[in-house]
Amino acid sequence: MPNPTQRFSNRVADYVRYRPDYPPAVVDTLRQHCGWTGPVDIADLGSGTGLSALGFLDAGHRVYGVEPNAEMRQAAEALLSSRQNFTSIDGRAEATSLADHSVNLVIAAQAFHWFDVAAVAAESERILRPGGYRAVLWNLRRTTGSDFLDGYEALLQRFGTDYAAVSERYADSQALALYFGEDGHDVYRFDHAQHFDFEGLRGRLLSSSYAPAPGHSQHLPMLDALQALFDATSANGKVAFEYDTCLYVSTPCRASSALPKPRTPALS
């Protein structure tokens, strides 16, 4: 498998334009779960192009975006250049360079599956303040439920260069157990979706590191198959790209009854 820190270097433009944001309820759920009464300091590990930081910044929190990939980090710096409460850090999740006990939350959004889990667990312990929280966040694409979703999953299985290996790493129960340790974690699920015309769908596909890039022998056949799928399943010129947004958060204290009921999502 290619070096995770370099997988997206040639896909940044599509990533910025076509990857989903996160439901606003994620930030509010964390606020309630963690008992925050004002702004806190957050380490965003594998912060990428800055999408995961936006909701926290809008809520007034300070975010330290830790990202090893230069192209992704520069995209985040451009997106968030006007945000005084965002700090961009050239670093890895396993070695953030943040000071000991300096943050209230460590979160990994759409990145945890690339980490050395034991090393990240140790680094999180080092940088968290007493009573701090760990969280993992994913937009998990639904692989079934409509003709489009079924067909898109089949397309990835057919053309994805290492799709099976990557998809198996998402929400791995053993990795999550190792990361959260004895305190365990709660899980919150939120519905989320994007609606794409063909240009958007093409960009969303090409933002994935396992999609054959231009010059690969399967690139054009893959796009032909994508066009055929879109033509067969679109309605009013759009397809629905649906997600389960899943938030895993540590539980040193229990969440309040006002929160969405924690539950383990059905993952495929």
Where on the chain are the PLM-derived regions?
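Conserved class I S-adenosyl-L-methionine
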Residues: 1-40
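Tryptophan-centric aromatic hotspots in well-structured domains and transmembrane helices
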Residues: 10, 14-15, 22, 29, ...
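Class I SAM-dependent methyltransferase SAM/SAH-binding core
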Residues: 41-43, 49-95
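Conserved Class I S-adenosyl-L-methionine
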Residues: 49, 173-268
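A short acidic, Gly/Pro-enriched loop at the edge of an enzyme's catalytic core
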Residues: 94-105
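Short catalytic micro-motifs in class I SAM-dependent methyltransferases
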Residues: 110
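A short, conserved alpha-helix within the catalytic core of class I
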Residues: 115-124
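Conserved catalytic/acceptor-binding region of the Class I
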Residues: 125-194
